[in-house]
C-alpha cells in the first residue's frame, strides 16, 4: 500500500512540476516578446512593480519633406527626378553634369539608374527657382552618351491616383514652360545675329561709300585701303 501511495504522490509531483514548467515557459515567452517589441509599443507596467516606473512611449518624429527638420524647423525642399542614367555613373560625374544648377544634395541610386536632386528653399529663397530651371533644362542632354530624363517629382512617395495625376500635370506644365524658354532663347539668339549682321553691313557700306580718288580704278582703290 505504501508503495502505491508513493507512486501516486510521484505522479502528482510530476504534474505539478510540468505545470510550473509550462507557466515558466509562458512567462519567458512574454518577456521575450516585450524585449522584441519596438520601443514605444511595449505595454506599460504598473507603478510599484519591481520598483520600476511605467515605460513612457516615445513620440515619433516625421522626416523628409513637410516634416520637422533639424532644430525643429519645417523642411522646405524641392526634388527633381533624374532617370535613364548609365548604370556605371558615379556621384562625382553626376555632380559635374549638374554643376550649373548647384543642387544642395544628390541622392544617387546607380543600380536603378536614377537620382534625386534636392533644392533647399531655406538656404536660397531667391535663387532656388532659377537653379531648378537650369537643372530641368538639362532634360534630354547626353551623359556618357546616354540621353537622360529630368523632371519634377511630387514628395510623399506612393502610387496613388491623385499623386500620379498631380505629377502628370506638373510635368505637362513644365514641358510647356521648357519649350517657351527654348523658343525665347532661339529668338533672342536670332535677334542678336540679325543685329550683328546689320551692324557689320552698315560698317561695310560706310567704308564702300568713301570717294574714289580720281584716275584710279575702283577695284584698285579697294586694294589700296
From Swiss-Prot:
Keyword Plastid included in the entry's annotation: no
Keywords linked to the UniProt accession: Nucleus, Phosphoprotein, Ribosome biogenesis, RNA-binding, rRNA processing
Residue stretches making up the RRM domain: 78-155
Subcellular location: Nucleus, Nucleolus
Molecular function terms, GO-annotated: ribosomal small subunit binding; RNA strand annealing activity; RNA strand-exchange activity; rRNA binding; snoRNA binding
Main location: nucleus
Biased composition regions of type Basic residues, renumbered to the chain: 9-20, 56-75
Region ranges (Disordered): 1-75, 187-225
Residue numbers of Phosphoserine PTMs: 45, 160
Misc: Present with 8970 molecules/cell in log phase SD medium.
Chain's role: Predicted to be involved in rRNA processing.
Protein name: Nucleolar protein 6
Organism name: Saccharomyces cerevisiae (strain ATCC 204508 / S288c)
Amino acid at each position: 500500500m505504501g508503495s502505491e501511495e508513493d507512486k501516486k504522490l510521484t505522479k502528482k509531483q510530476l504534474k505539478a512540476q510540468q505545470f510550473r514548467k509550462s507557466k515558466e515557459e509562458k512567462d519567458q515567452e512574454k518577456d521575450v516578446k516585450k524585449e522584441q517589441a519596438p520601443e514605444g509599443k511595449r505595454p506599460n507596467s504598473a507603478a510599484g512593480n519591481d520598483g520600476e516606473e511605467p515605460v513612457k512611449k516615445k513620440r515619433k518624429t516625421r522626416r523628409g519633406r513637410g516634416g520637422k527638420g533639424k532644430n525643429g524647423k519645417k523642411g522646405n525642399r524641392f526634388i527633381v527626378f533624374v532617370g535613364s542614367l548609365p548604370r556605371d555613373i558615379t556621384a562625382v560625374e553626376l555632380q559635374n553634369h549638374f554643376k550649373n544648377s548647384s543642387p544642395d544634395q544628390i541622392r544617387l541610386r546607380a543600380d536603378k539608374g536614377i537620382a534625386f536632386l534636392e533644392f533647399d528653399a531655406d538656404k536660397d529663397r531667391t535663387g532656388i527657382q532659377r537653379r531648378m530651371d537650369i537643372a530641368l533644362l538639362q532634360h534630354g542632354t547626353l551623359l556618357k552618351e546616354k540621353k537622360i530624363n529630368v523632371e519634377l517629382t511630387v514628395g510623399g512617395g506612393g502610387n496613388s491616383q491623385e499623386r500620379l495625376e498631380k505629377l502628370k500635370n506638373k510635368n505637362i506644365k513644365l514641358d510647356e514652360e521648357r519649350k517657351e524658354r527654348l523658343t525665347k532663347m532661339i529668338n533672342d539668339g536670332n535677334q542678336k545675329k540679325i543685329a550683328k549682321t546689320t551692324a557689320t553691313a552698315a560698317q561695310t557700306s560706310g567704308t564702300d561709300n568713301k570717294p574714289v580718288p580720281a584716275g584710279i580704278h575702283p577695284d584698285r582703290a579697294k586694294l589700296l585701303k
